[in-house]
């Protein structure tokens, strides 16, 4: 019991430290958006989004790996519009959730995993159609590995709205919020690095110090990477490519 309590106290202390150090720029629009748009977003990411978009090196596309119901997608678009940027936004998510392989139903409910996936996808489409209509993102229903293969091959593909787009070329920013295991996060970084232009930025979700996810291990490696510089931890890591 004592070990369990000690562990809980340590986790609480880590949470308090992250909260105290976090720069939060939530405004009225973000508050209303978060009421209606489901999502799991650390408020510290808002400042990182805003900072990255204000310092985009060009008008080349920005990418989002992992979109869920579109909360971060809509927030990124909000900051793009607010800063007068017109970068094309391209996102990918196949909506394959942890635990879906364990059974047909969500826990002890009568809701099927397939129904849940369809609901989340429909919610994403509805959310970005309303809140990002002035710069509607191109979304690919593929995994990040599949997406970067399409990008590498410079494929012309149709997004979930049926619009054609030619993939490929350099990008100016990537928000990595896909599978948080070390291997997946590492691969997402390596794929992003191939196309990120000099001065481009990468933000890793749930990468804060003490995070239980494997992507936190990757951060320890990236801070030693001479090709990148740490812009800020708030508490998640935002990097800029130096060369």
How would you name each of these model-derived features?
Residues 1-37, 242:
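Membrane-proximal basic amphipathic "stem/tether" segments
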Residues 27-36, 46, 50-243:
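S-adenosylmethionine/decaboxylated-SAM
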